[in-house]
From Swiss-Prot:
Its main location: secreted. The presence of a 'disulfide through disulfide knot' structurally defines this protein as a knottin. Keywords: Disulfide bond, Knottin, Secreted, Signal, Toxin. Residues 1-20 form the signal peptide. InterPro entries: Spider_toxin_CSTX_knottin, Spider_toxin_CSTX_Knottin_CS. It comes from Lycosa singoriensis (Wolf spider). It is found in: Secreted. GO terms for molecular function: toxin activity. Belongs to the neurotoxin 19 (CSTX) family. 01 subfamily. This is U3-lycotoxin-Ls1h.
Length: 115
């Protein structure tokens, strides 16, 4: 009976040790993957197209504003046959950003009043 108990404790110890090593390996792999994703994101962030610039080469390359990403909008200028695409902010998102900015300012005033 003692032999079975000692053998069981040995197996549990061995299993927990191997599980801990596997978890460490997974954590290290997750960290490496996260770092590579962050590096790619930083590299991609430098190549965004500013507002009102031509985005016909890549319609998903528009920069972000404070809260929302700008949208590549295409149109035909009056009297022209060529399509022109520029990064623009839709009006409803523009109004939402203004409302959020005013709410932040109002929240700051309330903090000062009751702070």
């Amino acid at each position: 009976m003692k032999f079975v108990l000692l053998f069981g404790v040995f197996l549990v110890t061995l299993f927990s040790y191997s599980s801990a090593e596997m978890l460490d390996d997974f954590d290290q792999a997750d960290e490496d993957e996260l770092l590579s994703l962050i590096e790619k994101e930083e590299a991609r962030a430098k190549e965004c197209t500013p507002r009102f610039y031509d985005c016909s080469h890549d319609r998903h390359s528009c920069c972000r504003s404070e809260l929302f990403k700008d949208v590549c909008t295409c149109f035909y200028p009056e009297g022209g046959d060529n399509e022109v695409c520029t990064c623009q902010q839709p009006k409803h998102l523009k109004y939402m950003e203004k409302a959020a900015d005013k709410a932040k300012k109002f929240g700051g005033k309330i903090k000062r009043w009751f702070g």
